[in-house]
Regions:
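Alpha-helical transmembrane segments of integral membrane proteins
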Residues: 67-98, 340-347, 376-403, 407, ...
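Short juxtamembrane loops and helix-capping segments at transmembrane helix boundaries
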Residues: 118-138, 267-284, 328, 337-346, ...
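Short, strongly hydrophobic transmembrane alpha-helices
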Residues: 94-121, 125, 369-371, 417, ...
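Mid-to-C-terminal secondary-structure elements
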Residues: 5, 185-209, 218-356, 429-433, ...
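Small-residue-rich transmembrane alpha-helices
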Residues: 116-117, 336, 374, 410-480, ...
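Interfacial "coupling" helices/loops that link adjacent transmembrane helices in transporter permeases
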Residues: 369-413, 775-817, 821, 871, ...
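Negatively charged linear elements and acidic catalytic determinants
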Residues: 1-102, 301, 336, 481-494, ...
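Membrane-helix entry/capping segments
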Residues: 54-99, 127-128, 140-145, 180-183, ...
Length: 884
C-alpha cells in the first residue's frame, strides 16, 4: 500500500507542479523569515538578520531542488530540462553536432548492415512454423549435407526421432507457359515436403506423398508467390492450368504463401515439383542409385520431447544398419544435426566465419568512432571549464552537470543511430533486390527486423554512455576556485593523457582496418593470377540444358555434336568444346576411385574422391588446358569403345604414385567399371579457389551422356560480335532451345564473388577507419595549435625556424600517430588467422602489405595535419603580442 500511495503521489506531482512550487516557495520564505525574526530578537539589525538567515540557509536553488526531488516529481522534469539544455548546446555548435552525428551514423549504420545480414542468414530460422525444432542432417567426417534417394527413404522410415523427413534438390528447367519459353529454377522435393514443414498454401493446394505412385507419376508444380505475381499477374485462375516443363505437361496445383521461398536461405526457386518426376526435369534417373549421395538435402521437425543428441543417436543406429546392409554403397554413415538454410558446414561454416569477422571489424569502427567523439567531448568539456567551475561555485552538484553531459552524449548517439539505421535500411533494400549471380537463383534476403532495430538502439545507447563518460574525471576533479582565479579556459585535470590514449586507440584501429583491406586486395590479386587450369580470356560460353527442349539420350548427343560443328564454322572461331559443369562456378560431381586390383568397392576402400567432368573431344583445346602426356579424346571414344579417361597430375600422383606410369594404367569407378587413363593434364581449381590440389578426371561425353552443358567457344573476334553470331547459329538449329551467352571471364567473376565481396567489405571498412583517423588526428592537431598560438607567436618572434614551430605544434600528434600505427600493424599481423577465414590467400606478413600500411598511415597523418600546420606557420607574432 505504501508503494501505491507513493506512486500516486509522484504521479500527482507531475500535474500539480506549479501549485506545489508556489507552496514550496512560501514555505521556504517563511522558514527564512522566522530565522531572521529570531536573529533580530537577539539584537541584530533587521537587514543584518535577514542576510545572516539567508547565509545560514545556504543555496536557495539547491534546497528547492532537493525538496522537489524528495517530492518525487523532479526527475522527469529535470530530464526534460536536460534535454532542452542539450538541444540548445548542440544548436550552438552546429559543426561539432554535424561531425558527431555523421561519425556515429557511419559507424552504427555499418554495424546495422552487417548484423542484418548475419541475422538473416545465420541467426534467424527459416520462415516456417515451429522453426526451432527444424533440423537438417549432415553425414560423415566431412559433414556432407546430401544423401541418395534410397538412403533418404531408409532414414525417413527407420528413424524414431522426427515427425517426418523431407528431401529437396535444386535444379533448372525450361518452362513454357504459352508465351516465349524460358529457363527457371526449381526445387525437386519429396511428396511430403510441404506437410513436413507444416505450411499452408496461399492458393489451391500442395502435392502430397499420396500423389507419388512411381517415376514420372506426379506431373504437378507449386508456384512461389513471387513467380505467380511476376509471370501470372496474380491470376487466381492459374490453378489447374497446364504448362510445359522441358516439353512435358505439368499441372499447376497451387501457390505457396508469400513469406515462404524455400528451405535454402539464399536460393529462391520459382516453383516446386515432385522428385519422382526427376527424369523429366533432368533427363536422367538417379532415384535408384543408392551410392549417388551428392543429391538430396534432408530436413524435418524433431518429435516433441526428443533432444538433438537423442536424434543423432537414433540416426546413427540407422546408419549402422545401412553400412551392414549395403556395404558396397554406404560407408561412414555417422550423422549430425544442423540448422537448415545454409547447407550445413559446407557453406554455413565459411559464411559464419566471414560475417563474424566482419562484425568484429565493424565493432572496431564503432569503437574508433567512440574514441573520436570521446576526444571531442574531452576538448569540449575543457573549453567549457570556466562555465562548469562557475556552476559548481554557485552550488550546482557535480552529478547534475555530469547528467547533462551524458544527456548531450546520448542525444547525439540516438540521432546518429537513427540516421545510420535509416541509411542501413536503404542499403538493405538494395541488397534484397540485388542478384549477385545473374544466372543463378541467388539473392540476399536481408531485412531490418526487430532484432536489427534493437541492436541499433543498444549500440546507440552504449556509444553515448561510452564517449560521454570521457569527461567524468575532468568534472569530478575540477577545483572551481582555482579555475576562476586563474581565468583559464584550458586544462581540466589530466585530459591530455585521456585524449592521447583515445587518439592512439583510434589510430591503432584504423591501422588494423587498413591492414585488413590491403590483405584482402593482395589476396584477390593472387586469386586473379592463380592457375585455374583453363584460360577464361577470349572465350565465350553457351550454357544450356538440352532436356529443356525435350532432347534426351542419343538425340541429346546428336544435337550437342551439331551445335559444336555449327559454332566451329563461325568465322574467327578457333575451337569449341563442351563440359557438363564449369570448373569453379558450378563445382563438380565427385566419385569414389579404386585401384584396378580392388574388388571390394565399398566407399571406405576408395583411394580417393575425384572431381568428375564429362567433356567433348576439343574441350581442352577450347579451354587452353595443357596436355602433359598422352592424348585427348576423339569422337570415336563412344559407348561402344573401351572406357577411357583423362586425369590431372594430382590424380596420377594420388592413385598411381607418379604421372610417369599413369598413362595406359587402369582404375575402377564406383560402379566397378575399369577405366584406362589415356592422357594427363595440368592441375587446376575445380570447386574453390582456396582448395588444395584435388584429383580430377575427365570422361568422354559420348560414354557418359549429359543433358546440361556449357559450350566453350575460343575465338580471336570481338566478344559482342561473336555473341550475335553464336545466338543466330544456335537459334537456326532449334529456336525453342533456351540458352545464355556470356564471356568466360564474366562467368568467372561468379567464382570470385566471395573474394570480391570480402575485398569490397573490408575496403569500405578500411576507408571508414581512415576517415575517422583523419578526423581524430586533425582534431588533435588543430586543438593543439589553437591552444598554443601565443606560444608559437613568441617562438617565432624570438627567431624560431618553421621546422621548429611545426615540431612544437604537431610533434605530439605525430608521435601518437607512430605509436598507434605500430600497435595497429602488430594487431593486424596477429589477426592473420581471422583474416584467413575471410579472404583467400590472406598473408598479413606480406612485405607489400606492411609497406602499404606504413605508407598509408603516414599519408593519412600528413593529410590530417596539413591545415593545422598551415595555421601554425601563418601565425603573425606581432598581432598576437599586440593582442596580449
Amino acid at each position: 500500500m505504501k508503494l501505491l500511495d507513493s506512486l500516486r503521489f509522484r504521479i500527482a506531482t507531475l500535474f500539480r507542479r506549479s501549485q506545489m512550487n508556489a507552496e514550496m516557495e512560501d514555505e521556504l520564505r517563511t522558514h527564512i523569515q522566522h530565522r531572521a525574526d529570531d536573529l533580530e530578537r537577539s539584537g541584530l539589525p533587521r537587514v543584518e538578520a535577514e542576510r545572516s538567515a539567508r547565509i545560514e540557509f545556504g543555496s536557495y536553488s539547491r534546497v528547492k531542488e532537493e525538496c522537489n526531488e524528495a517530492a518525487g516529481g523532479t526527475f522527469v522534469e529535470s530530464v526534460f530540462q536536460d534535454l532542452r539544455f542539450a538541444f540548445r548546446m548542440l544548436r550552438k555548435s552546429p559543426g561539432f553536432t554535424a561531425v558527431a552525428v555523421a561519425t556515429l551514423a557511419l559507424a552504427i549504420g555499418a554495424n546495422a548492415v552487417v548484423f542484418a545480414i548475419l541475422n538473416s542468414l545465420i541467426l534467424r530460422p527459416l520462415d516456417v512454423p515451429q522453426a526451432q525444432s527444424l533440423y537438417g542432417i549432415e553425414r560423415g567426417k566431412d559433414k556432407d549435407v546430401t544423401e541418395s534417394y534410397p538412403d533418404y527413404l531408409d532414414l525417413r522410415d527407420r528413424n524414431r526421432s522426427f515427425d517426418d523427413l523431407a528431401a529437396y534438390n535444386v535444379a533448372s528447367v525450361g518452362i513454357d507457359t504459352g508465351n516465349n519459353p524460358s529457363g527457371a529454377w526449381l526445387l525437386e522435393v519429396t511428396g511430403n515436403y510441404f506437410d513436413a514443414l507444416a505450411i499452408q498454401p496461399y492458393l489451391g493446394r500442395f502435392f502430397h506423398s499420396a500423389d507419388e505412385r512411381g517415376p514420372n507419376s506426379a506431373p504437378y508444380i507449386v508456384l512461389t508467390y513471387a513467380y505467380w505475381h511476376a509471370h501470372f499477374q496474380d491470376d487466381r485462375g492459374v490453378v489447374g492450368r497446364v504448362v510445359q516443363l522441358n516439353k512435358h505437361p505439368f499441372t499447376i496445383l497451387g501457390v505457396a504463401p508469400v513469406e515462404f521461398r524455400g528451405t535454402i536461405s539464399f536460393v529462391f526457386p520459382d516453383f516446386w515439383v515432385p522428385i519422382v518426376n526427376q527424369e523429366q526435369i533432368e533427363g536422367t534417373n538417379w532415384l535408384n542409385e543408392r551410392g549417388n549421395r551428392g543429391l538430396l538435402m534432408v530436413l524435418g521437425h524433431l518429435k516433441t520431447g526428443v533432444t538433438p543428441a537423442q536424434a543423432v543417436s537414433d540416426l546413427n543406429s540407422v546408419g549402422t544398419y545401412l553400412e551392414k546392409t549395403y556395404p558396397k554403397d554406404d560407408g561412414h554413415m555417422t550423422f549430425f544435426l544442423m540448422r537448415p538454410g545454409l547447407t550445413g558446414d559446407w557453406l554455413g561454416g565459411p559464411m559464419r566465419a566471414f560475417l563474424t569477422g566482419l562484425m568484429l571489424l565493424a565493432g572496431l569502427i564503432l569503437l574508433a568512432a567512440c574514441a573520436n567523439l570521446g576526444s571531442l567531448f574531452a576538448a569540449r568539456a575543457s573549453d567549457r571549464s570556466r562555465e562548469i567551475a562557475l556552476r559548481l561555485a554557485l552550488g550546482s552538484r557535480p552529478m547534475r552537470i555530469l547528467r547533462q553531459l551524458f544527456t548531450e552524449a546520448v542525444l547525439i548517439s540516438l540521432i546518429g543511430g537513427a540516421v545510420g539505421l535509416w541509411g542501413s535500411i536503404v542499403l538493405l533494400r538494395g541488397l534484397t533486390v540485388w542478384r549477385p549471380l545473374p544466372t543463378a537463383p541467388i539473392s540476399l534476403p536481408v531485412h531490418a527486423d526487430a532484432n536489427v532495430y534493437g541492436m541499433a538502439l543498444l549500440l546507440s545507447l552504449a556509444s553515448g554512455f561510452l564517449f560521454g563518460a570521457v569527461p567524468v574525471r575532468q568534472v569530478l576533479h575540477t577545483d572551481p576556485y582555482q579555475v576562476i582565479k586563474s581565468g583559464s579556459t584550458g586544462t581540466l585535470g589530466r585530459r591530455i593523457t585521456v585524449r592521447d590514449l583515445l587518439l592512439v586507440v583510434q589510430i591503432a584501429i584504423c591501422a588494423v582496418l587498413v591492414t585488413s583491406s590491403l590483405v584482402a586486395v593482395r589476396g584477390l590479386m593472387r586469386s586473379l593470377h592463380s592457375n585455374f587450369g583453363f584460360e577464361p580470356q577470349n572465350a565465350m560460353l553457351v550454357e544450356t540444358a538440352l532436356s529443356m527442349a525435350g532432347y534426351s539420350g542419343d538425340d541429346a548427343l546428336t544435337m550437342q555434336k551439331r551445335m559444336i560443328d555449327a559454332l566451329k564454322a563461325i568465322p574467327g572461331v578457333q575451337s569449341v568444346g563442351s563440359v557438363d559443369r564449369l570448373p569453379l562456378y558450378y563445382g563438380a560431381n565427385d566419385s569414389n576411385v579404386f585401384t584396378d586390383k580392388t574388388s571390394d568397392l565399398r566407399p571406405s576402400n576408395a583411394v580417393a574422391d575425384a572431381m568428375m567432368y564429362k567433356i567433348s573431344p576439343e574441350y581442352f583445346d577450347a579451354a587452353h588446358t595443357t596436355l602433359l602426356a598422352g592424348r585427348i579424346f576423339t569422337w570415336h571414344d563412344d559407348k561402344n569403345s573401351p572406357r577411357v579417361a583423362v586425369i590431372n597430375r594430382e590424380f596420377a600422383r594420388k592413385i598411381f604414385g607418379s604421372a610417369a606410369i599413369a598413362v595406359g594404367s587402369y582404375f575402377k569407378m564406383r560402379d566397378g567399371t575399369r577405366t584406362q587413363v589415356v592422357g594427363i593434364v595440368e592441375d587446376g581449381k575445380y570447386a574453390s579457389l582456396a582448395e588444395d590440389p584435388q584429383p580430377a578426371m575427365f570422361l568422354p561425353v559420348l560414354q557418359s551422356p549429359k543433358s546440361e552443358m556449357s559450350l566453350v567457344v575460343r575465338s580471336n573476334r570481338d566478344p559482342q560480335q561473336l555473341a550475335a553470331a553464336i545466338k543466330s547459329t544456335v537459334q537456326e538449329l532449334d529456336a525453342g532451345l533456351p540458352f545464355t551467352i556470356r564471356t568466360w571471364s564474366r562467368e568467372l567473376e561468379s567464382a570470385l564473388f566471395p573474394s570480391r565481396m570480402a575485398t569490397l567489405s573490408l575496403g569500405v571498412l578500411g576507408v571508414m577507419g581512415a576517415v575517422l583517423s583523419i578526423t581524430g588526428i586533425f582534431g588533435m592537431a588543430a586543438y593543439s595549435v589553437s591552444k598554443r598560438l601565443k606560444e608559437l607567436g613568441i617562438r617565432m618572434a624570438l627567431g624560431a625556424r618553421p621546422r621548429e614551430v611545426l615540431h612544437t605544434a604537431l610533434g605530439r600528434a605525430f608521435k601518437l600517430l607512430a605509436i598507434g600505427s605500430a600497435a595497429g600493424l602488430l594487431l593486424g599481423i596477429l589477426a592473420s588467422r581471422v583474416l584467413a577465414f575471410i579472404v583467400y590467400q590472406a598473408t598479413p606478413r606480406d612485405p607489400l602489405v606492411l609497406g602499404g600500411v606504413v605508407l598509408a598511415m603516414a599519408l593519412l597523418g600528413l593529410l590530417a595535419a596539413w591545415i593545422p600546420a598551415q595555421r601554425a606557420l601563418s601565425v603573425d607574432p606581432m598581432i598576437l603580442l599586440r593582442e596580449e
